[in-house]
Amino acid sequence: MNPAHLLVLPAVCVSFLGASIIPPQSLNLIQFKDMIRCTIPCERTWGEYADYGCYCGKGGSGRPVDALDRCCYVHDNCYGEAQKRNCNPYMKSYSFKCAKRTLFCYDAPGSCARFVCDCDRTAALCFGDSEYIGRHKNIDTKRHCQ
């Protein structure tokens, strides 16, 4: 056996081990990111919308600080409605298309996938229509969101 082959096997094993500790993102989150990218101004990234205001990001409480934060508040409530219908919005994938900053959901009306797609579509379009106020990124939620 060629000694170089002996070096390749451990490298492959190490790369698989390293990859296994990276937490996977749900397909739904990836799709939601793609929807956001479709609707927001080019100078912004989808990541700028995480940890914004009181509701954009994980959890939420208090009163939304602005129109953009209200988009996240409505999105959170929409996901809550999906869960009441025994639909897991965090894991459910769906079919959609982006064309010229417009989003189309293709799953059957009334299905779990369509419900989640409509939640994400509404939020992404709302993001695109709302002003981004830099001072609302990473705000002190204990102070502003009670």
Curated annotation (Swiss-Prot):
Q: Which InterPro entries match?
A: PLipase_A2 (IPR001211), PLipase_A2_Asp_AS (IPR033112), PLipase_A2_dom (IPR016090), PLipase_A2_dom_sf (IPR036444), PLipase_A2_His_AS (IPR033113)
List the subcellular locations: Secreted
UniProt-listed CDD domains: PLA2c
Q: Which cofactor does it need?
A: Ca(2+)
- Recite the UniProt keywords alphabetically: Calcium, Disulfide bond, Hydrolase, Lipid degradation, Lipid metabolism, Metal-binding, Neurotoxin, Presynaptic neurotoxin, Secreted, Signal, Toxin
Q: Which residues does UniProt assign to the signal peptide?
A: 1-19
Gene3D superfamilies attached to this UniProt entry: Phospholipase A2 domain
Q: Which PROSITE patterns match?
A: PA2_ASP, PA2_HIS
Catalytic activity reads: a 1,2-diacyl-sn-glycero-3-phosphocholine + H2O = a 1-acyl-sn-glycero-3-phosphocholine + a fatty acid + H(+)
Identify the EC number(s): 3.1.1.4
Q: Name one Pfam family in it.
A: Phospholip_A2_1
Which BP terms does GO give this entry? arachidonate secretion; lipid catabolic process; phospholipid metabolic process
The entry's note on the tissues where this protein occurs is:
Expressed by the venom gland.
Catalytic residues of the enzyme: H75, D120
Prodomain residues: 20-27
Disulfide linkages recorded for this protein, renumbered to the chain, are C54-C145, C56-C72, C71-C126, C78-C119, C87-C112, C105-C117
| Cofactor: how and how many bound | Binds 1 Ca(2+) ion.
Give the GO molecular function terms: calcium ion binding; calcium-dependent phospholipase A2 activity; phospholipid binding; toxin activity
Give any Gene Ontology cellular component: extracellular region
The principal localisation class reads: secreted
Q: Which residues bind Ca(2+)?
A: Y55, G57, G59, D76
Q: Provide the function of this protein.
A: Snake venom phospholipase A2 (PLA2) that inhibits neuromuscular transmission by blocking acetylcholine release from the nerve termini. PLA2 catalyzes the calcium-dependent hydrolysis of the 2-acyl groups in 3-sn-phosphoglycerides.
How this chain assembles, per its entry, is: Heterodimer with beta-bungarotoxin B chain; disulfide-linked. The A chain has phospholipase A2 activity and the B chain shows homology with the basic protease inhibitors.
User: What family is it from?
Assistant: Belongs to the phospholipase A2 family. Group I subfamily. D49 sub-subfamily.
Q: What is this protein called?
A: Basic phospholipase A2 beta-bungarotoxin A1 chain
| Organism in which the protein naturally occurs | Bungarus flaviceps flaviceps
